[in-house]
Protein backbone atom coordinates (compact mmCIF):
# COMPACT_ATOMS: atom_id res chain seq x y z
CA UNK A 1 0.00 0.00 0.00
CA UNK A 2 1.37 3.44 -0.93
CA UNK A 3 1.80 6.21 1.62
CA UNK A 4 -0.83 8.28 -0.21
CA UNK A 5 -3.56 5.83 0.75
CA UNK A 6 -2.68 5.79 4.42
CA UNK A 7 -4.92 8.02 6.49
CA UNK A 8 -2.77 9.75 9.07
CA UNK A 9 -4.82 10.96 12.01
CA UNK A 10 -3.88 12.54 15.33
CA UNK A 11 -5.60 12.71 18.69
CA UNK A 12 -4.86 15.90 20.62
CA UNK A 13 -6.26 17.01 23.97
CA UNK A 14 -5.56 18.52 27.35
CA UNK A 15 -3.51 16.38 29.72
CA UNK A 16 -5.79 14.30 31.93
CA UNK A 17 -8.79 14.52 29.61
CA UNK A 18 -8.60 10.80 28.77
CA UNK A 19 -7.06 11.33 25.34
CA UNK A 20 -4.85 8.22 25.35
CA UNK A 21 -7.62 6.06 26.80
CA UNK A 22 -10.14 7.33 24.26
CA UNK A 23 -7.75 6.93 21.34
CA UNK A 24 -6.70 3.37 22.29
CA UNK A 25 -10.28 2.22 22.78
CA UNK A 26 -11.24 3.78 19.46
CA UNK A 27 -8.24 2.27 17.65
CA UNK A 28 -9.10 -1.14 19.16
CA UNK A 29 -12.59 -0.85 17.69
CA UNK A 30 -11.20 0.19 14.30
CA UNK A 31 -8.86 -2.81 14.36
CA UNK A 32 -11.83 -5.07 15.12
CA UNK A 33 -13.34 -3.76 11.88
CA UNK A 34 -10.31 -4.97 9.94
CA UNK A 35 -8.37 -1.71 9.72
CA UNK A 36 -4.58 -2.05 9.76
CA UNK A 37 -3.28 0.54 12.19
CA UNK A 38 -0.09 1.82 13.79
CA UNK A 39 -0.13 3.99 16.95
CA UNK A 40 2.73 6.45 17.36
CA UNK A 41 2.72 7.75 20.92
CA UNK A 42 3.86 11.38 21.02
CA UNK A 43 3.33 12.05 24.72
CA UNK A 44 6.32 12.10 27.13
CA UNK A 45 4.31 9.91 29.54
CA UNK A 46 4.61 7.07 26.99
CA UNK A 47 1.13 5.79 27.88
CA UNK A 48 -0.32 5.81 24.37
CA UNK A 49 0.01 2.05 23.81
CA UNK A 50 -0.13 0.39 27.23
CA UNK A 51 -3.75 -0.80 26.90
CA UNK A 52 -2.98 -2.34 23.52
CA UNK A 53 0.12 -4.10 24.88
CA UNK A 54 -1.12 -4.96 28.41
CA UNK A 55 2.00 -3.28 29.78
CA UNK A 56 2.97 -0.47 32.15
CA UNK A 57 4.80 1.58 29.54
CA UNK A 58 6.49 0.67 26.29
CA UNK A 59 10.24 1.35 25.98
CA UNK A 60 10.58 4.50 23.89
CA UNK A 61 12.68 5.19 20.82
CA UNK A 62 14.47 8.08 22.51
CA UNK A 63 15.28 6.03 25.63
CA UNK A 64 16.77 3.19 23.61
CA UNK A 65 18.63 5.62 21.37
CA UNK A 66 20.19 7.25 24.45
CA UNK A 67 21.32 3.83 25.71
CA UNK A 68 22.83 2.85 22.36
CA UNK A 69 24.29 6.23 21.52
CA UNK A 70 22.27 6.99 18.37
CA UNK A 71 18.87 6.19 16.87
CA UNK A 72 20.68 4.69 13.86
CA UNK A 73 21.86 1.88 16.16
CA UNK A 74 18.29 0.66 16.75
CA UNK A 75 16.43 -2.12 14.97
CA UNK A 76 12.79 -1.56 14.07
CA UNK A 77 11.72 -4.74 15.90
CA UNK A 78 13.07 -3.34 19.17
CA UNK A 79 10.69 -0.38 19.21
CA UNK A 80 7.75 -1.57 17.09
CA UNK A 81 5.59 -4.00 19.07
CA UNK A 82 2.35 -5.72 18.09
CA UNK A 83 -0.67 -5.32 20.35
CA UNK A 84 -4.39 -6.11 20.45
CA UNK A 85 -5.76 -7.10 17.04
CA UNK A 86 -2.31 -6.73 15.48
CA UNK A 87 -2.13 -2.98 16.06
CA UNK A 88 1.48 -1.80 15.69
CA UNK A 89 2.67 0.20 18.70
CA UNK A 90 5.50 2.73 19.02
CA UNK A 91 6.34 5.32 21.70
CA UNK A 92 8.56 8.25 20.72
CA UNK A 93 9.46 9.25 24.28
CA UNK A 94 11.13 12.44 25.48
CA UNK A 95 14.15 13.80 27.39
CA UNK A 96 14.56 14.01 31.15
CA UNK A 97 12.27 16.62 32.77
CA UNK A 98 13.74 20.11 32.49
CA UNK A 99 16.23 19.13 29.80
CA UNK A 100 15.69 19.75 26.10
CA UNK A 101 12.53 19.69 24.00
CA UNK A 102 10.03 16.86 24.43
CA UNK A 103 8.97 17.38 20.83
CA UNK A 104 12.41 16.22 19.71
CA UNK A 105 11.40 12.63 20.38
CA UNK A 106 8.47 12.93 18.00
CA UNK A 107 10.67 14.20 15.16
CA UNK A 108 13.31 11.52 15.78
CA UNK A 109 10.73 8.73 16.04
CA UNK A 110 8.78 9.57 12.90
CA UNK A 111 11.93 9.93 10.80
CA UNK A 112 13.23 6.58 12.11
CA UNK A 113 9.93 4.81 11.40
CA UNK A 114 9.69 6.20 7.88
CA UNK A 115 13.27 5.27 7.04
CA UNK A 116 12.77 1.70 8.29
CA UNK A 117 9.54 0.86 6.48
CA UNK A 118 7.16 0.94 9.46
CA UNK A 119 4.45 2.65 7.40
CA UNK A 120 4.05 -0.19 4.91
CA UNK A 121 0.74 -2.08 4.56
CA UNK A 122 -1.33 0.21 6.77
CA UNK A 123 -4.75 1.81 6.50
CA UNK A 124 -4.27 4.27 9.38
CA UNK A 125 -1.45 5.81 11.38
CA UNK A 126 -2.62 7.38 14.63
CA UNK A 127 -0.52 9.96 16.49
CA UNK A 128 -1.41 10.43 20.17
CA UNK A 129 -0.15 13.91 21.09
CA UNK A 130 -0.02 15.99 24.26
CA UNK A 131 -2.22 19.02 23.65
CA UNK A 132 -1.99 21.46 26.55
CA UNK A 133 0.52 23.34 24.42
CA UNK A 134 0.93 23.15 20.66
CA UNK A 135 4.62 24.09 20.62
CA UNK A 136 6.95 23.40 17.71
CA UNK A 137 7.74 19.84 18.79
CA UNK A 138 4.22 18.76 19.67
CA UNK A 139 2.91 20.43 16.50
CA UNK A 140 5.36 18.42 14.42
CA UNK A 141 2.79 15.87 13.14
CA UNK A 142 0.70 18.86 11.99
CA UNK A 143 3.52 21.10 10.82
CA UNK A 144 5.26 18.47 8.71
CA UNK A 145 2.03 17.30 7.10
CA UNK A 146 2.25 13.87 8.72
CA UNK A 147 -1.16 14.00 10.38
CA UNK A 148 -3.87 15.13 7.98
CA UNK A 149 -6.90 14.68 10.24
CA UNK A 150 -6.92 16.10 13.76
CA UNK A 151 -9.39 14.87 16.39
CA UNK A 152 -9.56 16.87 19.61
CA UNK A 153 -10.63 15.05 22.79
CA UNK A 154 -12.35 17.51 25.11
CA UNK A 155 -15.13 17.86 27.70
CA UNK A 156 -17.44 20.54 29.06
CA UNK A 157 -14.81 21.70 31.55
CA UNK A 158 -13.31 25.13 30.98
CA UNK A 159 -9.64 24.15 30.65
CA UNK A 160 -10.42 21.24 28.32
CA UNK A 161 -12.32 23.65 26.06
CA UNK A 162 -9.54 26.23 26.33
CA UNK A 163 -7.02 23.59 25.19
CA UNK A 164 -9.33 22.52 22.34
CA UNK A 165 -9.51 26.11 21.09
CA UNK A 166 -5.71 26.44 21.29
CA UNK A 167 -5.25 23.21 19.33
CA UNK A 168 -7.69 24.49 16.70
CA UNK A 169 -5.52 27.61 16.47
CA UNK A 170 -2.48 25.39 15.83
CA UNK A 171 -4.35 23.48 13.10
CA UNK A 172 -5.35 26.76 11.43
CA UNK A 173 -1.74 27.94 11.40
CA UNK A 174 -0.66 25.00 9.23
CA UNK A 175 -3.92 24.35 7.33
CA UNK A 176 -2.91 26.19 4.17
CA UNK A 177 0.75 25.19 4.02
CA UNK A 178 0.42 21.56 5.10
CA UNK A 179 -3.14 20.63 4.18
CA UNK A 180 -4.05 19.50 7.70
CA UNK A 181 -7.74 19.65 8.64
CA UNK A 182 -9.81 19.36 11.80
CA UNK A 183 -11.88 16.17 11.78
CA UNK A 184 -13.99 17.06 14.81
CA UNK A 185 -14.31 17.20 18.57
CA UNK A 186 -14.74 14.05 20.66
CA UNK A 187 -16.49 14.80 23.94
CA UNK A 188 -15.17 12.50 26.67
CA UNK A 189 -17.93 13.25 29.15
CA UNK A 190 -17.21 14.56 32.65
CA UNK A 191 -20.96 14.88 33.36
CA UNK A 192 -20.87 18.67 33.25
CA UNK A 193 -24.33 20.28 33.06
CA UNK A 194 -25.54 20.62 29.44
CA UNK A 195 -22.25 19.13 28.26
CA UNK A 196 -23.54 17.66 24.99
CA UNK A 197 -25.15 20.93 23.92
CA UNK A 198 -22.10 22.93 25.05
CA UNK A 199 -19.59 20.93 23.00
CA UNK A 200 -21.91 20.89 19.98
CA UNK A 201 -22.03 24.69 20.21
CA UNK A 202 -18.25 24.96 20.60
CA UNK A 203 -17.79 22.69 17.58
CA UNK A 204 -19.99 24.94 15.44
CA UNK A 205 -18.05 28.01 16.58
CA UNK A 206 -14.82 26.24 15.55
CA UNK A 207 -16.30 25.36 12.13
CA UNK A 208 -16.25 21.64 12.86
CA UNK A 209 -18.48 18.87 14.25
CA UNK A 210 -18.84 17.10 17.54
CA UNK A 211 -18.01 13.72 16.09
CA UNK A 212 -19.16 11.71 19.10
CA UNK A 213 -20.22 12.06 22.74
CA UNK A 214 -18.53 9.34 24.80
CA UNK A 215 -20.57 8.80 28.00
CA UNK A 216 -18.80 8.39 31.33
CA UNK A 217 -18.74 4.75 32.48
CA UNK A 218 -16.72 3.12 35.27
CA UNK A 219 -16.10 0.11 33.05
CA UNK A 220 -13.36 2.19 31.38
CA UNK A 221 -11.48 2.36 34.69
CA UNK A 222 -12.08 -1.35 35.35
CA UNK A 223 -10.51 -2.16 31.98
CA UNK A 224 -7.60 0.23 32.60
CA UNK A 225 -6.78 -1.47 35.91
CA UNK A 226 -6.26 -4.64 33.88
CA UNK A 227 -4.29 -2.71 31.23
CA UNK A 228 -6.89 -3.52 28.61
CA UNK A 229 -9.18 -1.66 26.26
CA UNK A 230 -12.91 -1.88 26.96
CA UNK A 231 -13.36 -3.70 23.65
CA UNK A 232 -11.12 -6.51 24.89
CA UNK A 233 -12.19 -6.49 28.56
CA UNK A 234 -15.96 -6.23 28.03
CA UNK A 235 -16.67 -6.57 24.29
CA UNK A 236 -20.44 -6.84 24.77
CA UNK A 237 -20.76 -3.75 26.98
CA UNK A 238 -22.55 -0.54 26.02
CA UNK A 239 -19.28 1.37 26.35
CA UNK A 240 -17.50 -0.93 23.88
CA UNK A 241 -20.30 -0.21 21.42
CA UNK A 242 -19.84 3.54 21.96
CA UNK A 243 -16.22 3.20 20.87
CA UNK A 244 -17.30 1.13 17.86
CA UNK A 245 -19.71 3.88 16.82
CA UNK A 246 -16.93 6.46 17.19
CA UNK A 247 -14.53 4.23 15.24
CA UNK A 248 -16.98 3.91 12.35
CA UNK A 249 -17.54 7.67 12.34
CA UNK A 250 -13.79 8.25 11.97
CA UNK A 251 -13.54 5.66 9.19
CA UNK A 252 -16.46 7.31 7.33
CA UNK A 253 -15.56 10.92 8.14
CA UNK A 254 -15.43 13.26 5.15
CA UNK A 255 -16.16 16.45 7.10
CA UNK A 256 -12.61 17.78 7.34
CA UNK A 257 -12.53 21.54 7.86
CA UNK A 258 -10.23 24.50 8.41
CA UNK A 259 -11.08 25.60 11.97
CA UNK A 260 -12.12 29.09 13.08
CA UNK A 261 -10.70 29.51 16.62
CA UNK A 262 -12.46 31.93 18.96
CA UNK A 263 -11.03 34.53 21.33
CA UNK A 264 -10.70 33.99 25.08
CA UNK A 265 -13.51 36.51 25.62
CA UNK A 266 -15.77 34.59 23.24
CA UNK A 267 -14.95 31.32 25.02
CA UNK A 268 -15.75 32.88 28.41
CA UNK A 269 -19.02 34.29 27.03
CA UNK A 270 -19.93 30.79 25.85
CA UNK A 271 -19.18 29.36 29.30
CA UNK A 272 -21.27 32.09 30.94
CA UNK A 273 -24.14 31.37 28.53
CA UNK A 274 -24.13 27.71 29.59
CA UNK A 275 -23.70 28.46 33.29
CA UNK A 276 -20.18 27.03 33.58
CA UNK A 277 -18.84 30.46 34.52
CA UNK A 278 -20.66 33.23 36.33
CA UNK A 279 -21.22 36.55 34.58
CA UNK A 280 -19.58 39.81 35.66
CA UNK A 281 -22.42 40.58 38.09
CA UNK A 282 -22.08 37.19 39.84
CA UNK A 283 -18.30 37.55 39.88
CA UNK A 284 -18.43 40.96 41.59
CA UNK A 285 -21.03 39.67 44.06
CA UNK A 286 -18.85 36.66 44.96
CA UNK A 287 -15.79 38.90 45.41
CA UNK A 288 -17.77 41.23 47.71
CA UNK A 289 -18.97 38.28 49.80
CA UNK A 290 -15.39 36.97 50.13
CA UNK A 291 -14.14 40.39 51.20
CA UNK A 292 -16.97 40.64 53.74
CA UNK A 293 -16.03 37.27 55.24
CA UNK A 294 -12.40 38.35 55.53
CA UNK A 295 -13.38 41.56 57.35
CA UNK A 296 -15.52 39.67 59.89
CA UNK A 297 -12.71 37.25 60.69
CA UNK A 298 -10.07 39.95 61.30
Curated annotation (Swiss-Prot):
What high-level taxonomic lineage is stated for the organism?
A: Bacteria, Bacillati, Cyanobacteriota, Cyanophyceae, Gomontiellales
Q: What family is reported?
A: Belongs to the NifH/BchL/ChlL family.
PROSITE patterns tied to this protein: NIFH_FRXC_1, NIFH_FRXC_2, NIFH_FRXC_3
Keyword entries, A-Z = 4Fe-4S, ADP-ribosylation, ATP-binding, Iron, Iron-sulfur, Metal-binding, Nitrogen fixation, Nucleotide-binding, Oxidoreductase
Positions with a binding annotation for [4Fe-4S] cluster: 101, 135
Annotated positions of the ADP-ribosylarginine modification = 104
Assembly:
Homodimer.
Q: Which GO terms describe its molecular function?
A: 4 iron, 4 sulfur cluster binding; ATP binding; metal ion binding; nitrogenase activity
Question: Which note does the record give on the cofactor?
Answer: Binds 1 [4Fe-4S] cluster per dimer.
Give binding positions for ATP: 13-20
| One GO biological process term | nitrogen fixation
Required cofactor(s): [4Fe-4S] cluster
Q: Which reaction does it catalyse?
A: N2 + 8 reduced [2Fe-2S]-[ferredoxin] + 16 ATP + 16 H2O = H2 + 8 oxidized [2Fe-2S]-[ferredoxin] + 2 NH4(+) + 16 ADP + 16 phosphate + 6 H(+)
HAMAP family under this entry? NifH
Chain's gene name = nifH
Function per UniProt: The key enzymatic reactions in nitrogen fixation are catalyzed by the nitrogenase complex, which has 2 components: the iron protein and the molybdenum-iron protein.
EC numbers: 1.18.6.1
Name of the protein described by the UniProt record:
Nitrogenase iron protein
PTM characteristics: The reversible ADP-ribosylation of Arg-104 inactivates the nitrogenase reductase and regulates nitrogenase activity.
Q: What class of enzyme is it?
A: oxidoreductase
Amino acid sequence: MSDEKIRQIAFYGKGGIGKSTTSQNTIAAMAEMGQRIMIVGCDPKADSTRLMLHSKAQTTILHLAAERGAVEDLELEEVLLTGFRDVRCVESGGPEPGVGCAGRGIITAINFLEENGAYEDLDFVSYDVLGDVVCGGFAMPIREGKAQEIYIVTSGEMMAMYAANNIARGVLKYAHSGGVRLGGLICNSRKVDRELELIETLAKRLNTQMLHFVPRDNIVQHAELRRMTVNEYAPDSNQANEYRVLAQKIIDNKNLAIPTPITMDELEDLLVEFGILGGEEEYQKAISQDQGKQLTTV
